From Swiss-Prot:
Superkingdom field: Bacteria
Alphabetical list of InterPro entries matching this protein: ATP_synth_b/b'su_bac/chlpt, ATP_synthase_B_chain
Any one annotated GO CC term: proton-transporting ATP synthase complex
Taxonomic path: Bacteria, Pseudomonadati, Pseudomonadota, Alphaproteobacteria, Acetobacterales
Subunit (UniProt): F-type ATPases have 2 components, F(1) - the catalytic core - and F(0) - the membrane proton channel. F(1) has five subunits: alpha(3), beta(3), gamma(1), delta(1), epsilon(1). F(0) has three main subunits: a(1), b(2) and c(10-14). The alpha and beta chains form an alternating ring which encloses part of the gamma chain. F(1) is attached to F(0) by a central stalk formed by the gamma and epsilon chains, while a peripheral stalk is formed by the delta and b chains.
Protein name: ATP synthase subunit b 2
Amino acid sequence: MRRTTILLAATALGLTPAIAMAEGKMPQMDFSNPLTGAQVVWMAVIMVVLYFVLARWALPRIGGVIENRHNRIATDLETARRAKAEAEHAVRELNLAIQNARESSQGAIAEAVNAAKERARAQTAALNDRLSAQIASAEAEIDSARRTAVGALAPIARDVASSLLQRLIGEAVEPGRIEQAVSALSTQG
């Protein structure tokens, strides 16, 4: 196809002077002048030589360069596709590793939280037991102190009651009756 195109172009180029002369518009193409014919012949010879030089030497080299370039581009595109596939695979693996690490860390955090809660429960239970024991001890001490205080108040209450009754009624009241009344009041209260 290239050769056909080149031959058609050469034929058109060769017919150009004749067409121009037929129209009478180009005096430099006047074939009645002997120099014009020689110039056209040399031009045709140069064109044929140029055609063969281009067809046999330059165009195959240019075609080789174009073919090499096409092969290089195809190779580069294939390399780029492989690199893209490897990069996508690496990104998928990275995302999977990140997801696994996230799940693992969330599991570790949950375990740590549960362990801390369990320790807090144990410490709370131990503290509650200790506080309950201290409260029971304090209540026992308070009860003992109250009994001691009430026990210490009984003789004072007897003496005060005896003195008051003696002043109120003017005579001494029997100590057994005062003891009985103080005992009855201390047990009620």
